[in-house]
């Protein structure tokens, strides 16, 4: 039997689609969907119900209805692309410069959902081909909300992976300043001012947070530290990936570096400022390879990496650095150590380390957490000095380390 004969054989078509559908149901793990096999059987064999009710069956020689044909094509495209986006791969746009020079602002990525396993939509009532906004309004309804669930993928997140994820603080958004972190604005100016000036406030489901793209530098169970800009994982210096860049002060002999040289290095000329008083460039973002090229320029006198030490140049900079407490005395270049929680692991809690895990316990793992005036920690009504985590966590950094 030829392929053409198989295509026109209704039993062969029914068997083919039934096998594919059955494999999908097994992967999905929701066996109520097995009733869909009855739909496939009826559509191909018994034809008791016209499942594609919008699609007209034409008699031989009958003129086709262009409107119905377009409707059929649109419905097919919406269903097919939505299915592909949920379970297989999806296009994303780089929203910021935090990954330069590895990934540039405005770059489009096709991200595989199969690698880590696709996440089942928690908010299924969404306008197709939108994420969270359309025409300045939210593009979804929260009438139906599902629990977080991810299907099995080929592997887990590994150190060094580029990862697209929902911005952790993106559950709350100021409508007049959606690109600004609500919690950071509140820390700087107070909640009342933030809401009055930039509100109203929108609360978004977990799968409708804005997408961010970063590199995973630490996985669950790791202890992360940054010492003078060098990342350490479990006390071992981490590999510096080719795209990672820091900010340097470049002093010249009074002349500017050739523009063609700067463009060849991939630097954004419009963002580089030359200071005649230095003389040179007060801030120049460079990777290791770019640093070598700049040092080789004949008119460059010195190149010095900018390393934030404590106390920082800006006294309130801790308000932008997790865990947002001045008592930690951390900076972006001298940070930690911080232990990354993993499922099943228990951590001892006290008032000193509680800020590191408070949001995880309260928001991500949905517990009631309170602290008494005397400093006692109460979780779900019980006084405790420890907590066992339910999920694995990861630590992300942008490759553009001083602008991320």
Residues covered by each model-derived region:
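Extended hydrophobic leader/signal-anchor segments used for secretion and membrane insertion
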Residues: 1-404
């Amino acid at each position: 039997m030829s392929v053409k004969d198989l295509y026109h054989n209704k039993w062969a078509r029914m068997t083919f689609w039934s096998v594919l559908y059955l494999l999908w149901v097994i992967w999905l793990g929701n066996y109520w969907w097995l009733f869909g096999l009855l739909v496939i059987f009826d559509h191909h064999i018994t034809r008791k119900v016209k499942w594609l009710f919008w699609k007209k069956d034409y008699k031989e020689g009958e003129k086709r209805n262009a409107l119905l044909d377009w409707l059929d094509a649109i419905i097919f495209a919406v269903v097919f692309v939505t299915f592909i986006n949920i379970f297989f791969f999806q296009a994303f746009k780089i929203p910021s410069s935090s990954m330069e020079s590895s990934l540039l602002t405005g770059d489009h990525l096709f991200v595989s959902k199969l690698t880590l396993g696709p996440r089942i939509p928690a908010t299924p009532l969404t306008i197709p081909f939108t994420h969270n906004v359309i025409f300045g309004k939210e593009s979804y309804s929260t009438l139906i909300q599902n629990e977080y669930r991810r299907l099995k993928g080929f592997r887990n997140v590994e150190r060094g992976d580029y990862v697209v994820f929902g911005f952790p603080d993106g559950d709350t958004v100021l409508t007049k300043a959606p690109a600004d972190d609500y919690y950071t604005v509140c820390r700087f100016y107070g909640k009342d001012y933030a809401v009055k000036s930039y509100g109203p406030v929108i609360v978004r489901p977990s799968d409708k947070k804005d997408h961010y793209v970063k590199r995973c530098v630490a996985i669950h169970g790791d202890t992360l530290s940054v010492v003078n800009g060098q990342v350490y994982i479990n006390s071992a210096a981490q590999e510096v990936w080719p795209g990672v860049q820091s900010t340097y002060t470049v002093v010249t002999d009074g002349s500017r570096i050739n523009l063609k040289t700067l463009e060849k290095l991939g630097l954004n000329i419009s963002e580089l400022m030359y200071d005649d008083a230095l003389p040179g460039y007060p801030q120049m973002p460079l990777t290791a390879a770019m640093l070598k090229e700049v040092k080789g320029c004949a008119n460059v006198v010195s190149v010095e990496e900018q390393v934030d030490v404590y106390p920082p140049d800006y006294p309130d900079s801790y308000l932008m650095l997790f865990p947002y407490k001045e008592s930690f005395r951390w900076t972006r270049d001298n940070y930690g150590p911080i232990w990354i929680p993993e499922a099943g692991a228990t951590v001892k809690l006290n008032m000193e380390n509680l800020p590191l895990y408070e949001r995880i316990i309260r928001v991500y793992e949905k517990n009631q957490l309170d602290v008494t005036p005397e400093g006692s920690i109460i979780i779900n009504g019980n006084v405790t000095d420890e907590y066992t985590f339910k999920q694995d966590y990861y630590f992300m950094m942008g490759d553009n380390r001083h602008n991320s």
